[in-house]
């Protein structure tokens, strides 16, 4: 369970529009003392990318970069970075919807995330919004 959250604002990117503060560093502290940091940039000039790494006591775990071909040609080597989320998550959203349909039809007995999970996410979101405004660590409602 998360008990405290904070949001920090590094130097803003020149690509942020209006009053948007971008990037943002989100910090979340769990009851057991685990510290989670999430770096968010809504105006990444180079494209859409999700990176995730767990740093643990005995090693690290990193999600793989989305499977994209690496092209070597004309003295260059690289791969495309998608413009948005649609290509990366279309299959995941289809599978999630199918799982829900299967549950409604009695084909599986585990419904997945429910109202209580959504309520917990809302409490964390409320604390994060407050932390964006105050610049302080904020307590997540119990």
What positions do the PLM features span?
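A general structural signal for well-ordered alpha-helical segments in protein cores
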Residues: 71, 94-100, 125-126
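Short acidic/polar mixed-charge low-complexity motifs
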Residues: 32-34, 57-60, 79, 109, ...
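C-terminal helix-rich "cap/oligomerization" subdomain common to oxidoreductases
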Residues: 31, 102-142
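Short polybasic amphipathic segments
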Residues: 52, 68-78
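Rossmann-like dinucleotide-binding domain that binds NAD(P)(H)
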Residues: 1-35, 41-46, 116, 120
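A generic structural motif
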Residues: 29-31, 55, 74-76
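C-terminal substrate-binding/catalytic lobe of Rossmann-fold NAD(P)-dependent oxidoreductases
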Residues: 46-48, 55, 64-65
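Active-site loop of classical SDR/Rossmann-like NAD(P)-dependent oxidoreductases
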Residues: 45, 85-98, 113
